[in-house]
Amino acid sequence: MSSELNIPVDPSTPAVSERGNKGMDYRDWVRRSYLELVTSNHHSVQALSWRKLYLSRAKLKASSRTSALLSGFAMVAMVEVQLEMKYGYPQLLLIAFSACTTVLVAVHLFALLISTCILPNVEAVSNIHNLNSVNESPHDRMHPYIELAWGFSTALGILLFLAEVVLLCWIKFLPIDSALTRNETATTQKPRGNAGWNSALVSTIIMVPVGIIFVIFTIHFYRTLVRHKTERHHQEIEELHKLKVQLDGHDRGINVV
């Protein structure tokens, strides 16, 4: 009787059943992790799309404000500038001032046109509190135009504005020499005739380094931004590679089980 009760049990049987239970739990865990990964990737794509939308909206707003301000200043400067009829301006100076003002206004109005056309559509989508509504925004399709408006308004537009300031200084200060020469006829002092020229030259000397610094800063900012995006893409690729290695290891474990 005791021999019947003390039946030897194969020690591998509970281990196999326990391993099978563990294998099923492990498969469920991998399946659940995969579903969570897919869900998180979906939300990550949605978050990236919303980030691009908000960035495009911010660029369009900044472009429209900057373009409206600088183009208005250029128009007022061209209208309000008073030319001395008795002074013989250099022909190249007048041509440069006219061309710079016209190009400045045209560039900023073009950027303002792009911002005015695209911004309402982006604003309408950004005010909808729905994750899937980001696909209705035209910011991805209009991305080249948004970048063009941003570049015209900030980079090219500001450089033209600096050139406009220099040309205005030359136009306003050059006639001072002839006015001083006419006023010095009643005095015994020798007329200098260099005040206007020196004033315009000083403004040019100051503005040239400012323009160079602006160009260097623009290039440095662009390179830094590109480097940051590249590093972020490398990090995302490394994270995806790690996830792939982990999933491959899990699949091998499941196959072994």
From Swiss-Prot:
Ca(2+) release-activated Ca(2+)-like (CRAC-like) channel subunit which mediates Ca(2+) influx and increase in Ca(2+)-selective current by synergy with the Ca(2+) sensor, stim1. It comes from Xenopus laevis (African clawed frog). The keyword Iron does not apply. It is a multi-pass membrane protein. Keywords: Membrane, Transmembrane, Transmembrane helix. The chain crosses the membrane at residues 62-79, 94-114, 156-176, 201-221. This is Protein orai-2. Gene3D superfamilies: Calcium release-activated calcium channel protein Orai. It is found in: Membrane. Belongs to the Orai family. The keyword Transcription regulation does not apply. GO terms for cellular component: membrane. GO terms for molecular function: store-operated calcium channel activity. One of its GO terms (biological process) is store-operated calcium entry. Its main location: membrane.
